[in-house]
Structure formats: structure tokens, C-alpha cells
């Protein structure tokens, strides 16, 4: 009988009875109304909040991406400017070094020309002084020779002695 009771009970659930359908519908509608009043609002607002939070996160992510791209562009521009500035500084340094080298070379050339000119002038003065001294000595020797000739006899032996004497005088005066 127990078996037949289960079948009977199962049969009553499967067979549509108007009272059961009515009360099931009423219960379903009441549950929907209660859920709409109590749970539907908070669920929808939670979903909307969640959607707003996700949208806000997406917007912030887009903003951060754009900002990072802008910073990256700015960094690249700054790097390019720094490279250009470094190239300019190096170029100016090289130009300045070349200018200084040229100035130093020119100054050294001028100094060497001055030194050469001064040395030539000094050599020329020494040469003139030596020639003047030599002329004076030759004149002195000539005067002494003439004096000796006038005092002595003019034969060949005397002349030879006078010349030898003048040569010796010249040698001793130079030393």
C-alpha cells in the first residue's frame, strides 16, 4: 500500500488540478512581488554599482594608458633633445679645441719667427762687431807694420820678419 500511496501522490502532482495551478501562480506572483520589493532593488543597484565600478576602472585604465603614452612620448622627445644637445656640445667643444689649437699654433709660429728674427739680428750685429773689430785690428797691424817698415831697412829679410811679427801679433791679440 505504501507503494500505491507513492504512486497516488506522484500522480496528483503530475495531473494538473485547477486549485493547485491557482495557488502555485498566486505563490509565484507573491514571491516575485516580495523579491521585487525587497531583493530586486538591491540586486539591481549592486549590479549597477558593479557596472559603474568596472566602467570607472576601464576609464582609469584608458586614462593611465594615455598618460603613460604621453609620458613615453615626452621622454622620447627629451631624450632626442638631450642627444641633440650632447651632439651640439661635443661639436662646439671640438670647434673650440680646433680654434685654440690654431691660435696656439699661430702664436708659436709668430714666436718662432720673432726668435729667428732676433737671432738673425743678433748674428748680424755680432758679424758687424766682429768685422769692425777685425778692421780695427787690421788697421792697427797695418799701422804697426808701416811703423816698423819706416823704422827699419826695407830689404826682403826685414819685410819677411815684419810680416811674421805682424802674424804673431795678430795671433796673440786674438787669443
Curated annotation (Swiss-Prot):
F(1)F(0) ATP synthase produces ATP from ADP in the presence of a proton or sodium gradient. F-type ATPases consist of two structural domains, F(1) containing the extramembraneous catalytic core and F(0) containing the membrane proton channel, linked together by a central stalk and a peripheral stalk. During catalysis, ATP synthesis in the catalytic domain of F(1) is coupled via a rotary mechanism of the central stalk subunits to proton translocation. Component of the F(0) channel, it forms part of the peripheral stalk, linking F(1) to F(0). It is found in: Cell inner membrane. Its main location: membrane. The lineage of its organism: Bacteria, Pseudomonadati, Chlorobiota, Chlorobiia, Chlorobiales. It is a single-pass membrane protein. GO terms for cellular component: plasma membrane; proton-transporting ATP synthase complex. InterPro entries: ATP_synth_B-like_membr_sf, ATP_synth_b/b'su_bac/chlpt, ATP_synth_F0_bsu_bac, ATP_synthase_B_chain. Keywords: ATP synthesis, Cell inner membrane, Cell membrane, CF(0), Hydrogen ion transport, Ion transport, Membrane, Transmembrane, Transmembrane helix, Transport. CDD domains: ATP-synt_Fo_b. Belongs to the ATPase B chain family. This is ATP synthase subunit b 2. F-type ATPases have 2 components, F(1) - the catalytic core - and F(0) - the membrane proton channel. F(1) has five subunits: alpha(3), beta(3), gamma(1), delta(1), epsilon(1). F(0) has four main subunits: a(1), b(2) and c(10-14). The alpha and beta chains form an alternating ring which encloses part of the gamma chain. F(1) is attached to F(0) by a central stalk formed by the gamma and epsilon chains, while a peripheral stalk is formed by the delta and b chains. Pfam families: ATP-synt_B (PF00430). The chain crosses the membrane at residues 20-40. GO terms for molecular function: proton-transporting ATP synthase activity, rotational mechanism; proton-transporting ATPase activity, rotational mechanism. It comes from the Bacteria.
